[in-house]
Structures are given as C-alpha cells and as structure tokens.
C-alpha cells in the first residue's frame, strides 16, 4: 500500500520528470538493503533481535505517518519522499535479518519448513492485496489515508512483538564485525547452492 501511494505521490510532485524520480525513489529505497543487510545480519547475532525488529517497525511506522502529515499539511516536497524512502530502506535492512533469525527461536525445528512457507505466503499475499487496497483507498480517501492506514498497520506488529517473551542469547564469537562479515561471505562462497541462490535472488530483485 505504501509503495503504490508513494509512486502516485512522486508522479504528482515530479510532473514531467516523474520517470526519473520514480526510478530514484526506488533506488534510494533499495540501496540501503543492498549495502547494509549483511551488517544487519551480524547485528542480529549480537543484539536482541526482538528489540532490533521493534526499532525497525517503529522507524517504518514513523516514516508512514511522516508522509501522511506532510501531505495533509500540504508541505510535501519530492526530497521529503526520497529521504523517507532511504530511511525506510535502512530500517528494512536491519529489520529483515532480525525477523528471519527470530523465527527459529519461536517454533520447534521440525515446524520450521512450514513456518518459512507460511511466511512466504503471507509476504506474497500482501504484495497482491496491497496494491488493490492502495488503489481503493486512494480513490475513496486520498493519499493521506493510504499512508495513515499503513502507519496504523505497524501497530499490530508492534503489539505482537511486545507480547513476545524471547530470551536473547548472544552468539559468542569474540570477533570484530568486519571479521564476521568476511567469515559469512567466505562460507557462502564455498557453498555452491548458496552462491546460486544468492545470484538468483540478486538478479530477480535487481530486475524487478
């Protein structure tokens, strides 16, 4: 919902330059994910994953409400949208690894494949339903409602995370963060299956 409303907002603000700014907006939103997700994985190993994910949700909720407020008070500018896209991308870069690594702590190992499948289903279902809801909300209530509803949706996730009681057990390494990053990349490089999956994932993400 957020992305579709944001694209419409960029079209409205940029006018004849909308193609460039649409591309720039997507680039700035995805660049932090490309650059910082590896670091986010190391941070998720070292720190409380639930708190890290909570922080990510708070930031994304704030950017949604921020856009709603800027549009409502008619002070929105294209640079606001670009900046908030980058901030959202940064939050996702650290929240994504925390989310993925939190899941095995919540369920039995035998149920993990089903949990991963269910997580994938809900993610893709949201990608299908989100644009439909965004279009309906835009037509009926306008952009403020789209951003506001998206911001409110984070409250449910935050409430669920606050209700979780997961004991944080740091991964003992004694290594510097840079060394852990190198170790992770070295492991992936020597696992052919992981290399293939990484290339496929990068290509599909990059090409849309």
Q: What is the role of each PLM region?
A:
Residues 1-208:
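Alpha-helical transmembrane-bundle signature of multi-pass membrane transport and export proteins
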């Amino acid at each position: 919902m957020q992305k579709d409303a944001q694209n419409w907002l960029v079209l409205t603000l940029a006018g004849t330059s909308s193609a460039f700014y649409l591309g720039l907006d997507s680039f700035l939103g995805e660049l932090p994910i490309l650059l910082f997700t590896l670091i986010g994985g190391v941070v998720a190993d070292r720190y409380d994953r639930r708190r890290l994910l909570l922080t990510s949700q708070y930031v994304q909720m704030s950017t949604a409400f921020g856009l709603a407020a800027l549009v409502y008070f008619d002070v929105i500018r294209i640079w606001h949208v670009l900046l908030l896209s980058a901030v959202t991308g940064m939050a996702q870069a650290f929240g994504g690894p925390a989310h993925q690594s939190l899941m095995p702590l919540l369920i039995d190992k035998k149920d993990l494949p089903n949990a991963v499948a269910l997580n994938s289903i809900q993610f893709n279902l949201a990608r299908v339903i989100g644009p439909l809801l965004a279009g309906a909300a835009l037509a009926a209530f306008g952009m403020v409602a789209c951003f506001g509803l998206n911001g409110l949706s984070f409250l449910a996730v935050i409430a669920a995370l606050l209700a979780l009681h997961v004991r944080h057990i740091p991964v003992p390494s004694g290594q510097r963060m840079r060394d852990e990053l190198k170790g992770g990349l070295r492991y992936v490089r020597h696992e052919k299956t992981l290399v293939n999956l990484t290339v496929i994932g990068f290509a599909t993400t990059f090409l849309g």
